[in-house]
Amino acid sequence: MRFPRIIISSDRSNSGKTLVTAGLIKVLSKRYKVRGYKVGPDFIDPMYHKIASGHPVINLDLWLMGESGVYSSLAKYGKHFDLGIIEGVMGLYDGLYEDYSTYKLSELTHTPLILVINCSNLSSTVGAIVKGLREYRNANVRGVIFNYIASEKHLDYCKKSIPENVEVLGYLPIDKSLSVPSRHLGLYTTEDFKNAKDVINATANLIEMNVDVDKIVEIAEEANELQESNEIEERNVVGKAYVAYDSAFSFYYDENIDILKKRYDVEFFSPLNNDAPADQPSFIYIGGGYPELHLEELENSTKTKDWIKRNVEKGVKLLAECGGFMFLSNEIINEKSYRMIGLYDIQIKAKDKLTIGYTELETEKDNLLSSKGESIRGHEFHVSKAVSVGDVNFAFKNKHGKGIWNGKDGVYVENSLGSYSHFHFSRTRRLLSF
């Protein structure tokens, strides 16, 4: 299967990869049908790519999905698209180990790399960085884009430093208006950053003026052909799934929603709007996000809270990840206490030190996602913590990662499961048969 594609990488985070990727997708979407991808478990960066392309953006995470899962998703979601633009994670060789890095994904999928280098306070050293990234593991680095260029002289120094076997594809000048605000879990979500579309459009304009987009397409065409995915897309709808989505709960993998659609008709509801859908759900899914920024509204969303608790008590299946798990607790403390759903006898402190990283969980009790004895993988990403735990049952023992309490994760009541871990459903197929 022919699918031209590139990976945008760098030497570190905060290089401008996300905006450059989104701007490039926007420019290329004028001429091609472009699929955006994101290396790693991040939920927020893909939101910007989705605005640029108008299409769902697919995560490619070697820890969560495995090599075969990543390859399959790359091919499956590249079908019927002209180009793939993949944003890397952190620096080129960074990850849990190098085996889970952007470099590893480039090698696995035979996809050429383009580097975005933050040139602030650098000039000729840029060449040393590019040379080092390329030669450290003989990575397929084909080009470089300079970011945050201050002047023509600055640009000239950077250009002259680059090895001859790496194409200088262009640059973006310093423009303080082209920035996305950050907070404790990374960039603002596009739900909360209302200028996201304008910033992406302005970045795209700069790319059109200063970057050789045609050369980028030529490099993308060097990517090896992919083995076409032979996954059979069968739907066997057994009911309706309701997915919480608003500014409090917006951390979802687009592929997870696609997987749910194989078994359910999927609709969305908003706890912040106090929604209580009239139709009977077969499954409720509450993802992560920023509930700690909306505690008063969530405390007052009595219709939604009653609807969720009532349905779980009736045996409806529910999965709650991170922020969703917090919403199911007794209360969340952020200076004062805010009452939540109370399905789980747990008290949460909203703001603590950052917990971030991959998890591996040993299943001690059959649940929505896995059977006893099975190991599943996830990802933690939060600043809250449990400070009091009552009489609750845990489905998982943490082999890797922190979990909720004393090395345990996955609280269950009836057919519900609440965890600090986020999961990728491509590796939790029990969900579709439970």
Curated annotation (Swiss-Prot):
Listed name of the protein: Cobyrinate a,c-diamide synthase
Pathway: Cofactor biosynthesis; adenosylcobalamin biosynthesis; cob(II)yrinate a,c-diamide from sirohydrochlorin (anaerobic route): step 10/10
Summary of the function given for this chain in its UniProt record: Catalyzes the ATP-dependent amidation of the two carboxylate groups at positions a and c of cobyrinate, using either L-glutamine or ammonia as the nitrogen source.
GO BP annotations listed: cobalamin biosynthetic process
InterPro entries: CbiA/CobB_synth (IPR004484), Class_I_gatase-like (IPR029062), CobQ/CobB/MinD/ParA_Nub-bd_dom (IPR002586), GATase_3 (IPR011698), P-loop_NTPase (IPR027417)
Organism: Sulfolobus acidocaldarius (strain ATCC 33909 / DSM 639 / JCM 8929 / NBRC 15157 / NCIMB 11770)
Catalytic residues (positions): 322 (nucleophile)
Record bears the keyword DNA-binding: no
SUPFAM superfamilies in UniProt: Class I glutamine amidotransferase-like, P-loop containing nucleoside triphosphate hydrolases
Catalytic activity field: cob(II)yrinate + 2 L-glutamine + 2 ATP + 2 H2O = cob(II)yrinate a,c diamide + 2 L-glutamate + 2 ADP + 2 phosphate + 2 H(+)
Similarity section: Belongs to the CobB/CbiA family.
Comment text on domains: Comprises of two domains. The C-terminal domain contains the binding site for glutamine and catalyzes the hydrolysis of this substrate to glutamate and ammonia. The N-terminal domain is anticipated to bind ATP and cobyrinate and catalyzes the ultimate synthesis of the diamide product. The ammonia produced via the glutaminase domain is probably translocated to the adjacent domain via a molecular tunnel, where it reacts with an activated intermediate.
MF GO annotations: ATP binding; cobyrinic acid a,c-diamide synthase activity
